[in-house]
Structure formats: C-alpha cells, structure tokens
Amino acid sequence: MSTIKKVVLAYSGGLDTSVILKWLQETYDCEVVTFTADIGQGEEVAPARAKAETLGVKEIYIEDLREEFCRDYVFPMFRANTLYEGEYLLGTSIARPLIAKRLAEIASATGADAVAHGATGKGNDQVRFELGVYALQPDIQVIAPWREWDLTSREKLLAYAETHGIPVEGKRGGRSPYSMDANLLHISYEGGPLEDPWFEPEESMWRWTTSPEASADQAAYLELDYRCGDIVAINGEVLSPAKVLESLNQLGSKHGIGRLDLVENRYVGMKSRGCYETPAGTIMLKAHRALESLTLDREVTHLKDELMPRYANLIYNGYWWSPERSLLQQLIDGSQVTVNGTVRLKLYKGNVVVVGRRSETDSLFAPEIATFEDDAGAYNQQDAEGFIKLNALRLRIEALKKQTH
C-alpha cells in the first residue's frame, strides 16, 4: 500500500464515491485526484467539486463529455445495430470506455500510481473499467474498494460518512429502492424489488418515459437525415450527436417509447434483472436498420447481422479498447459509406413505425425490376428456372439417396 502515492478516483460526488475518497486517504495515506464526467446523467456535477474540496482534494477534474460520448461511442455502436442478447441497447456498457480512457489519461498527466472506481465486486462495471484502463495504461494499478473493505451495506456507508464528517444528502430510509445509472443514452434500474423477476415495477419507477397507455393520443411524425450511417439532422434541423440524443429522448419519452424489462447474463457469471428506458436509442435502431435495408447489399447486411452479436458481446464485456473490437469497427464503418438518406417515422403509444425511407444517392431499390406490373423486360422470369434447379440440385441428390436406402 505504501507504494501508492497518488490515485485518480472516478468520482460522482454521491455517497459511495465520497466514502471511497476518504477511505483511500485513510487506507493508503495517498493523495486523491477526482475525476467527474458529465455524460448526460441529468445531475448537476458542479457540487462534486465542493464536496471534493471539503475532503481535501487539490486536483479536481470535472469534464463535459456529452458530445464526445455520443460522437465517438454511441454513434459508432449504432452503426452496427447493436443489441446484447437481442434486446439490450448497452446504455451502461458503452459509457464505460470513455470514463476508463479519461481515468488513464488523467493518471498519466498527474503522475498517479493508481486509479480507483466505485463498481462493486459482483457486477460488470468493475470488469469494464479495469479492462479499459489496463488496455490504455498497462502498468497502472487499480484499486476497487468494494472488493477490499467491510462496508457492505448502505447503513455502514452512512455510518462511516457520519463518523468522518462526509457531507451526505440522502439520509437513512430516504432513497429510491433501486440502483440507477443514467447518461444521454439511457437510464437503468436494478436491485430492490426487481431482484424478484416476477415483480412488475410500479409506474412511479420509470423516470423518463410516459407509459404507452398514458402517452400522447396524437402520433408524431419525424424525419431523420443520415450521412455515412449517422444521424445529422432531425426534421431538417442539423444537430450535433448529443443534441440528436436529447431531441429524440424528448420525443420518444412523450410517446412511451423505449421501456425494457429483461434478465441478462452478466459477464461475471450470474443472471441479473434490469429495467431500462432508452427512447432515443430505440428510435435510432429502428431508423438505421430501415435505411440500411435500402442502401446496403444483401450479403453485406447479412454479414453485419452475423457479426453484430460478437460486437455487442465485446462492448458488454468491456473490450471496447481491444484489437478485435477495433477491427470489427473498421469493417462496420466501411459498410456505412453508402448509408445516406432520410427515414420517416411515426411515433405512437410505445411504437416506432417506419413509414418511409429514401436515398437519392445510394438506394439499391430498383422499382423497374421489383414492380408487380409490366417491367418492360427488365427482369426475365424465365431465368429463375435455371437458378432454382441449380440450387435444388443438392436437395434432390439427398432425396434420391434416401429413396434408394
């Protein structure tokens, strides 16, 4: 422990990380540098500075990373139509690589020996943070207090805070029963009553979205303009990546879009039940697939669909900074050169309905061939006979073999 002189702590300013800050000072007798990231969690991050100063911190980093988060992490992920286990839009997972990157960079800039985080020893985030940091700063040490200390309950954390004069807003008995995580892409809920997979959460749990039943009775139409697989404008208004998510979150929430309740397989081996609200991401996934259906070659589309689960697993498990994720990203990004155009959507009571798609430059839809009417010889239907016979050849050989036995 004595070899660690300076630690960079991923610091939210909440109870857990404030206790960790003091615990690091006492346990390691080290200087602590705090890093607080604004990735759109909807909380004021400025109070983290005052609290860190109260606890004697001299080097404090508070950074607005919303645009970088959306531009360099969320948008590239959506180019792949990424879903983990067919449902989860990876809202928590995709935020961790950026935080790990800044932890490693700040450690290097400040001469820190170690980084620390507040992830528990039972979850995926400890893996994501640490794999990311090691990939970028291979000689760094990592301190994970939840794997070391005996403060195993909120009551113990509160008692520690009171004993050490740590300012705490939430007192005993006055908090949500859920463990929550939020950023511009989503908000998640775990723990508490949700640990019973049969339990239906109360309507009051959902903080972002109106229930589909109570959502607007009038459908909303919108048009999303894409360039190289990324949304660049909504209803003709050019927006930055972060503004795209903010706008779609507002629209989707109003129309009851983006709720998800699932049991997922954690990388650390257990099953976990979580509820998520991802209005913007739900809209983005539907729209992106619609435009790809118009502009991507069939085999390219199918290859992307085959690779997507592997890509999703890499993000979920914490391998964003791995060479294999980078290689897949190059392939995915290369496929997006032709994903240019506009998608028209209807939002209504929890549904995202594609009602139109067009691309003036890259559409592979050939109406003169696909038409049910007279195609003026553009497609010779007689050619289909040979195509079918050749593709049926192996099936016929197999059937004949069975008949002779």
UniProtKB/Swiss-Prot annotation:
GO annotation, cellular component aspect: cytoplasm
Binding site residues for L-citrulline: 88, 93, 124, 128, 179, 188, 264, 276
Where does it live in the cell? Cytoplasm
Q: What are the recorded GO MF terms, alphabetically?
A: argininosuccinate synthase activity; ATP binding
InterPro entries listed in its UniProt record: Arginosuc_syn_C, Arginosuc_syn_N, Arginosuc_synth, Arginosuc_synth_CS, Arginosuc_synth_type_1_subfam, AS_cat/multimer_dom_body, Rossmann-like_a/b/a_fold
Record field: catalytic activity: L-citrulline + L-aspartate + ATP = 2-(N(omega)-L-arginino)succinate + AMP + diphosphate + H(+)
Q: Tell me which EC number(s) this protein carries.
A: 6.3.4.5
UniProt pathway: Amino-acid biosynthesis; L-arginine biosynthesis; L-arginine from L-ornithine and carbamoyl phosphate: step 2/3
Name the residues that bind ATP: 10-18, 37, 118
Database matches in PANTHER family: ARGININOSUCCINATE SYNTHASE (PTHR11587:SF2)
Please report the name of this protein according to its UniProt entry. Answer: Argininosuccinate synthase
Q: Which organism is it from?
A: Nitrosococcus oceani (strain ATCC 19707 / BCRC 17464 / JCM 30415 / NCIMB 11848 / C-107)
Q: Which gene codes for it?
A: argG
